[in-house]
């Protein structure tokens, strides 16, 4: 949703032509390569006003929803991303973030409970932004702005029927946070007579780990499950862990989505293009309802190799609908 007009439209057309019909859309809160913008209005003094919107941000989001709907492309939104709220990487995203009390006119550090610097990896869970809900620390100051953002997002997205909702990107935060926002989104949707599909994406690479039980064990809150982190593995281990998740869910079956397949030459994870190709097919043949290559350099994106895999998968599915068969081992 952060790109200017022509670049994403060309990519969506390329995706649809290859037989693809699913994209990932994090509601990015970081400046990337000069084209990304924030959802809030910026004042002449350089500070943000969290009570005023940046219209361009929301116009881009609306365009994404409109153009993907025209092409029958499913949009999986990620509402929050912990990496946007940290200074751990060289980009130091938190230093420029509108929620940083140094960067807005709406609250101070003492009023919000937010520091102006968070140098640790977000996996250490030292960012109070993700502890605001009533069954956590109930930070009313921050929660009001978070709710306002989600309400604005839903104002746009609930007008469409091709949107899935994921609370976070690869989090290891508290279950109470995910449960609150899943319930919040569902209630807002029902107020508009809409039904929504919601999940959470946990960071644990082990699908049999306790984190994933937080979604697996709560079908009343989570309509599908996210298994992207399984693709950090490869070969038999990747296959076996996906099979274990599928078996665990068999009592109350729900779709398993893989919105990020890792693996590309030059990846920070030391992976290869071949690993990405194999990972895509393992997830697809193992029962994933949706499979998408992660962006470069962590994945193959929508390059020629990815397009070839999409076309092959579509041809296979035309001959043997994959939902009509089961893995044999």
Describe these PLM feature segments.
Residues 1-222, 234:
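Active-site mouth of glycoside hydrolases
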